[in-house]
């Protein structure tokens, strides 16, 4: 990190797995790394345990995410699903935020269930054909697929950590501390630039 700081980099892109993501944030913080923008594809920073461990050290980082509690991501059935799931998760003592994996996990099974019901089949070919030509209404919005099985329209977005104070979990229950920057249709905040401005 000190070598990167010595180059006075404008942009630092980090692609890392969970424990490395934590280590990179801590090392950058210790080295007082100060590019204009930092982040990228840091696996793990979506997890409550790492958000609360790193706390304010995350301020300013840009990272990918799939679902956050933004008004723009509240589709038909989303709030009812989250209420039910979060109550169960709390009773079980797991998933304190209750929204990183749950909405998409539910939507994936919902889509598969709808395809099986519509085709009355478990045949891979029939299911694949149906999945390719159908748009599904789910708790994560409309889901449709391209020719190769990929999403017809990507749902990965970039979000920026900001305004984190301390290590409490409750501050992560809104987009006040993790704003969706792109894509525009789901945007919940503007990028704070440069990095040091988001650190204040």
Which role does the model predict for each range below?
Residues 7-8, 34, 57, 134:
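Structured helix-beta-strand junction loops
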Residues 2, 6, 22, 26, ...:
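Solvent-exposed, polar/charged alpha-helical surfaces in well-ordered, non-transmembrane soluble domains
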Residues 95-106, 128, 140-147:
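Short catalytic/ligand-gating loop segments at beta-alpha or beta-beta junctions
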Residues 132-200:
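Solvent-exposed, acidic/polar segments of extracytosolic/periplasmic ligand-binding ectodomains
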Residues 28-106, 117, 122, 175, ...:
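Extracellular/periplasmic periplasmic-binding protein-like sensory domains
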